[in-house]
Structures are given as C-alpha cells and as structure tokens.
Amino acid sequence: MKCFAQIVVLLLVIAFSHGAVITGVCDRDAQCGSGTCCAASAFSRNIRFCVPLGNNGEECHPASHKVPSDGKRLSSLCPCNTGLTCSKSGEKYQCS
C-alpha cells in the first residue's frame, strides 16, 4: 500500500509540474524541436507529443497550418513541412 501511495504522489507531481517536459511529451509547439509540432494524441486530447511536420503524401488537417500555434493544438496531425500545402486528395487531406 505504501508503494502504491508513492506512485500516486509521483504521478501527481509529474502531472502538475510545468517546469519539466518529458522527452517527446509536450504542451505547446515551443517545447518541440525544429521540424515538429505539439500534436494531440489520437486517443486523448489531453496528452500531446512532439510529432514531425507532414511530408509529401502524408495525411494532414486543413485547419492545422501554423507553427508555432497560438494555443494548444487539437489535431493529432502537424501542419505540412515548408513548401507543402494541405489539400484534399480523394477522401483525405494530404501534404503536396
């Protein structure tokens, strides 16, 4: 039981700390490296990861076009890389 309590406390400290970002996990684009954005997880919009910008032929979201974003990105997809645009291709949007 003591170990369980310690794990819970550790998880709470991690969840509410704003000073440290675990590698790959982010809150905003500014915390990610060049060529990436802070995209929402496909499973939970409360969890975000640094994800590479879209390359030619990769799926994109038409409303996700600015890096760094002014707020928290809601899409699980990053904008397209420099020089590419997000356009509709059949049923999906792709970087081209």
From Swiss-Prot:
Residues 1-19 form the signal peptide. Expressed by the skin glands. GO terms for molecular function: toxin activity. It is found in: Secreted. InterPro entries: Prokineticin (IPR009523), Prokineticin_domain (IPR023569). Disulfide bonds join C26-C38, C32-C50, C37-C78, C60-C86, C80-C95. It holds the Pfam family Prokineticin. GO terms for biological process: endothelial cell proliferation. Keywords: Disulfide bond, G-protein coupled receptor impairing toxin, Secreted, Signal, Toxin. One of its GO terms (cellular component) is extracellular region. Belongs to the AVIT (prokineticin) family. Potent agonist for both PKR1/PROKR1 and PKR2/PROKR2, and inducer of a potent and long-lasting hyperalgesia. Also potentiates capsaicin-induced TRPV1 current, when tested on DRG neurons. At subnanomolar concentrations, this protein both induces potent chemotaxis of macrophages and stimulates LPS-induced production of the pro-inflammatory cytokines IL-1 and IL-12. In vivo, potently stimulates the contraction of the guinea-pig gastrointestinal (GI) smooth muscle (nanomolar concentration). PANTHER family: DICKKOPF-RELATED PROTEIN 3-LIKE, PROKINETICIN. This is Prokineticin Bm8-f.
